[in-house]
Amino acid sequence: MARANPRRRATAAKDKWKMKEWFVVYAPDFFGSKEIGLTPADEPEKVIGRVVETTLKDLTGDFTKGHVKLYFQVYDVKGQNAYTKFKGHTLARSYIRSLVRRRTTRVDGIFNITTKDGYKLRVMGMVIAYRRIQTSQERAIRRIIQDIIYKKAEELNFADFVLQSVNGQIASEIAKEARKIYPIKRAEIRKIKVLAEPEA
């Protein structure tokens, strides 16, 4: 079987790369429609579906938010512009590790919720208590995480729920209530995943 000439293969690959265009990727409206990256493709259709990762620091300029990772998926391309929708967020593992030290208790809660405008999300909340706590206290704190997340989902539309999650507002409410049970170090919404969008 004849083998392709390595030089020809390299030239073909180079030519294919030259044919690609760069598309500017934008965040959704509720994140200010800011530019979040560039992506290459030889056809606009190939850009659709791509997921772009950025941080809240890059979007807002707030250097304290570098640990908040955001994921956006391209759903539409017009000209050289690619438009995205929010797919989820997570906190950097190194940040979470920095919170969880010896003699602390990590309380997690994972909940499937529906926002006021019909988006189905999986939301993961987390509270770090300063010391080892009793099982009853752990249950009480987990219930607080659950109650506040469900309450916010009933009150807020998708965009506002996401914004209040990633900027720490919902976590602040959780922390305020959890401190009535036991002194805590930190509360966070550590992850959101979009499960389903409302039917058009």
From Swiss-Prot:
Family under the similarity heading: Belongs to the eukaryotic ribosomal protein eS1 family.
PROSITE patterns from the UniProt entry: RIBOSOMAL_S3AE
SMART domains reported for this sequence: Ribosomal_S3Ae (SM01397)
Pfam families listed in its UniProt record: Ribosomal_S3Ae (PF01015)
UniProt cross-references to InterPro entries, sorted A to Z: Ribosomal_eS1, Ribosomal_eS1_arc, Ribosomal_eS1_CS
GO molecular function: structural constituent of ribosome
GO terms under cellular component: ribonucleoprotein complex; ribosome
Domain of life: Archaea
GO biological process, alphabetically ordered: translation
Record protein name field: Small ribosomal subunit protein eS1
Presence of keyword tRNA-binding: no
UniProt entry keywords in alphabetical sequence: Ribonucleoprotein, Ribosomal protein
